[in-house]
Amino acid sequence: MGKDDVVQSGAGGGEFAAKDYTDPPPAPLVDAAELGSWSLYRAVIAEFIATLLFLYVTVATVIGYKHQTDASASGAGADAACGGVGVLGIAWAFGGMIFVLVYCTAGISGGHINPAVTFGLFLARKVSLVRALLYMVAQCLGAVCGVGLVKAFQSAYFDRYGGGANSLASGYSRGAGLGAEIVGTFVLVYTVFSATDPKRNARDSHVPVLAPLPIGFAVFMVHLATIPVTGTGINPARSLGAAVVYNKDKPWDDHWIFWVGPLLGAAIAAFYHQYILRAGAIKALGSFRSNA
């Protein structure tokens, strides 16, 4: 008997095997009925506000750190390099905000806060096309508004310190930047799938682990690895919002990396989880044979 099965007594005294978890049905590709549901628009609003707050806190942290460590601005000379929250603090800001916001919005919208996450879940048929598109639009608009708030509150420093925009660091090729974004987003989306897997939830129901916790830690760890390369995108809305508000040439030069990389990473993670770990291809083949 496989690990996915438990033994239950049948009505006739026999025994039969049944799953100890239930997979939700696949979301329809297009669900027109969703457009008449308030729950959809409530979820879209939640994604907008969550992404706005995410960009506001994280970009403000980046700008503040750069100001604190600017020797010419602080007058601290060589000691300025030891000031501020540091790269570790920036990574904590991103990971911590994801933990908080996913916890707050998971029951309303699923807590995506990232077009790459939404795209991966759409490919896995966890959300419909209508919901996925509305989420992505809301996330991008929320990101622009969030960075806009940072510029409004820190207008003296926003442009001077790069507006928190992602760009390819000097010394790295476009291939290296693209690869870093693909791998980083794969780690994040793979963690999302694993943390929300109904099989894991059934087996680990006795362990009080919140799904937002590993997701936030994944964001934290990826930032530590990727900040020196691209400033860490792994979220097209985050990269777009900062690029739009900052609106200088450098962030736009290689902006495609921060869309292509995360979307590819999300697609690979969705395929790996659904068709390798969850054996989706084998299940589909078995269903085809049984119906033949």
From Swiss-Prot:
GO terms for cellular component: membrane; plasma membrane. It comes from the Eukaryota. Its main location: membrane. The chain crosses the membrane at residues 43-63, 82-102, 133-153, 175-195, 207-227, 257-277. A motif (NPA 2) lies at residues 235-237. One of its GO terms (molecular function) is water channel activity. It is found in: Cell membrane. A motif (NPA 1) lies at residues 114-116. CDD domains: MIP. The keyword Iron-sulfur does not apply. SUPFAM superfamilies: Aquaporin-like. Residues 1-20 are annotated as: Disordered. It is a multi-pass membrane protein. Keywords: Cell membrane, Membrane, Repeat, Transmembrane, Transmembrane helix, Transport. Aquaporins contain two tandem repeats each containing three membrane-spanning domains and a pore-forming loop with the signature motif Asn-Pro-Ala (NPA). NCBIfam families: MIP. Belongs to the MIP/aquaporin (TC 1.A.8) family. PIP (TC 1.A.8.11) subfamily. Aquaporins facilitate the transport of water and small neutral solutes across cell membranes. This is Aquaporin PIP2-2. The gene is PIP2-2.
